[in-house]
């Protein structure tokens, strides 16, 4: 279910303060995967936490409106069963 239009997009207040205070080229670490990407974020690099480490995400114009968490996957695909060492 999508967020109501009357509420507007969500972004953590602390994250927005970090973005305005950040210098160019600085990686902004965040645990807020639920925050919406705003146009003010374009050209900045965020370190988005995936539960284990911070994944660097460079924000481009196409990403505006999406959530930060969409670009830092939390699960690693190990692949389907291989036939390693199995001989016919």
Swiss-Prot record:
It comes from the Bacteria. GO terms for molecular function: rRNA binding; structural constituent of ribosome. GO terms for biological process: ribosomal small subunit assembly; translation. Keywords: Ribonucleoprotein, Ribosomal protein, RNA-binding, rRNA-binding. InterPro entries: Ribosomal_uS19 (IPR002222), Ribosomal_uS19_bac-type (IPR005732), Ribosomal_uS19_CS (IPR020934), Ribosomal_uS19_SF (IPR023575). Belongs to the universal ribosomal protein uS19 family. Protein S19 forms a complex with S13 that binds strongly to the 16S ribosomal RNA. This is Small ribosomal subunit protein uS19. It comes from Mycoplasma mycoides subsp. mycoides SC (strain CCUG 32753 / NCTC 10114 / PG1). The gene is rpsS.
């Amino acid at each position: 279910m999508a967020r109501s239009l009357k509420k507007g997009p969500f972004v953590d207040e602390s994250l927005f303060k970090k973005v305005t205070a950040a210098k160019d080229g600085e990686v902004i670490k965040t645990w807020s995967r639920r925050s919406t990407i705003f146009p003010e974020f374009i050209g900045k690099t965020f370190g988005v936490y995936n539960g284990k480490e911070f994944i660097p995400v460079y924000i481009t114009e196409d990403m505006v409106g999406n959530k930060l968490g969409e670009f830092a996957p939390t699960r690693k695909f190990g692949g389907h069963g291989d036939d390693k060492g199995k001989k016919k």
